[in-house]
Amino acid sequence: MIITKISRLGTYVKVNPHFATLIDFLEKTGLENLTEGPIDIDGDRLFGNCFTYLADGQAGAFFETHQKYLDIHLVLENEEAMAVTSPENVSVTQEYDNEKDIELYTGKVEQLVHLRSGECLITFPEDLHQPKVRINDEPVKKVVFTVAIS
């Protein structure tokens, strides 16, 4: 798991070969020009989804992991929390779905990560995470970039 500002994402280009493509896309497009909905960047290797919602989750309601992709959760407006935990703190509630690349769990929160505008959380397959944990009553605008691991 990596917690950083979007302005420092370039620091992590060696982590995944698709990060350089994402940085190039963001430099050419600009965060302020992202519109709601799906974002096609590089086929099934790198794509995103931009959306606005009221964070309504209670920490620990569920956790998720992915096997084929990592997530970059980037808050564009307002703030939200992400609950994170370790494998020994959860039990599986939905077995891994290969088509959707998700496995769901319930369990105990280990930490809350507070994300503000311009900050992002990068989650890897071993990182159990729960997005959309409410901080306040204002809408959150966020983009989640989905990045192929290999």
Positions of the model-derived regions?
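A short hydrophobic beta-strand segment most commonly corresponding to one strand
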Residues: I72, C120-I122, D137-S150
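An anionic, turn-rich surface loop/hairpin at beta-sheet edges
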Residues: T93-V113
